[in-house]
């Protein structure tokens, strides 16, 4: 079976052998690395390689501001909070608890193109109704609670201005600025063609940016989806693609590219092993990898259902086998953590 990225790379080579003015955008950096390897294998000529970007890197380039760390964002958010009309300001240590949640909310507001003032006004009105009572006077606690919702649009505006003044932004703000800048970006790069490869679910800003590029006939998009999931209206895996097909004007004239029929046409082999305890599971993984050829190892993914298995599996991987690990793990599970405990 030909891998998805190899298939798409080969298709692009045939359609556009000149990569000097192309940008390939992927959901992750890792996908770009694999695509680059397939490009080298499938192309025998000496060429200028295209530019490979993750969607985050592409958005950052469009936004023309730098990503801000969570710590910096929280500090600027607290400064903005101190400038609002709330009388009894909380200390920074108390603020961090709910400030992190507000930061996440602001991030989602910008990523999905929501108007903060309208959103928080609606929420404030709902809170007013939920705390309505026959008594004319509200308690001081209720007044403070309602005041908090009232100042959130102001907090959002102050916070956004502070970030832009420093040329930085949280992820949502990067998406917002990228969407604003996309038209000028295409004008500045009149000869560049864009390929979006391996996407499925998109947030509102990503969807609008890609649709604009497609509407200007400046690129193509290749979806990582199987026909089986697309045609089954009850299957969650095809939900977003069915939504795109229904809502995107682009699909009124064009068919989705990249959609395959691998799921039903490819023979599947499933081996089930009954193994007790975490260490035994990790050891079994090591034994199976020992039986694989180098080529099989390069095309193998180990998906763990529990992050606690990560350390045992790392120790069970055969010597000399290079593993690319992308998985979060608590610092408490690192041996060095004992030094600072």
List PLM regions with ranges.
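Nucleic acid-machinery interaction/catalytic patches
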Residues: 1-341
């Amino acid at each position: 079976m030909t891998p998805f990225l190899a298939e798409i790379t080969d298709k692009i080579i045939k359609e556009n052998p000149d990569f000097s003015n192309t940008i390939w955008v992927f959901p992750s950096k890792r996908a770009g690395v694999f695509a680059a390897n397939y490009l080298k294998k499938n192309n025998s000529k000496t060429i200028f390689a295209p530019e490979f970007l993750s969607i985050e890197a592409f958005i950052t380039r469009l936004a023309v501001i730098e990503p801000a760390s969570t710590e910096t964002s929280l500090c600027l958010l607290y400064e903005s909070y101190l400038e609002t009309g709330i009388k009894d300001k909380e200390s920074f240590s108390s603020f961090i608890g709910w400030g992190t949640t507000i930061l996440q909310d602001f991030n989602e507001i910008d990523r999905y193109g929501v108007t903060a003032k309208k959103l928080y006004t609606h929420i404030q009105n709902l809170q007013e109704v939920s705390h309505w009572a026959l008594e004319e006077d509200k308690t001081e606690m209720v007044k403070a609670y309602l005041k908090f919702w009232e100042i959130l649009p102001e907090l959002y505006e102050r916070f956004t201005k502070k970030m832009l003044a420093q040329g930085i932004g949280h992820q949502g703000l990067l998406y917002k600025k990228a969407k604003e800048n996309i038209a000028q970006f295409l004008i500045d790069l009149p000869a560049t063609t864009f390929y979006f490869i391996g996407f499925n679910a998109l947030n509102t800003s990503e969807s609008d940016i890609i649709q604009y590029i497609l509407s200007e006939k400046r690129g193509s998009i290749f979806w990582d989806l199987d026909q089986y999931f697309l045609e089954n209206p009850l299957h969650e895996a095809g939900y977003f693609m069915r939504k795109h097909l229904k809502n995107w004007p682009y699909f009124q004239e064009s068919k989705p590219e990249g959609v395959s029929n691998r799921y039903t046409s490819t023979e599947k082999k499933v081996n089930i092993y009954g193994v007790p305890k975490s260490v035994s599971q990790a050891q079994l993984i090591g034994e199976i990898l020992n039986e694989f050829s180098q080529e099989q190892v390069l095309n193998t993914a180990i998906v763990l259902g529990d992050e606690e298995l990560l350390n045992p599996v790392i120790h069970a991987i055969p010597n000399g086998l290079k593993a690319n690990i992308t998985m979060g793990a608590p610092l408490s599970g690192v041996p060095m953590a004992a030094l600072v405990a």
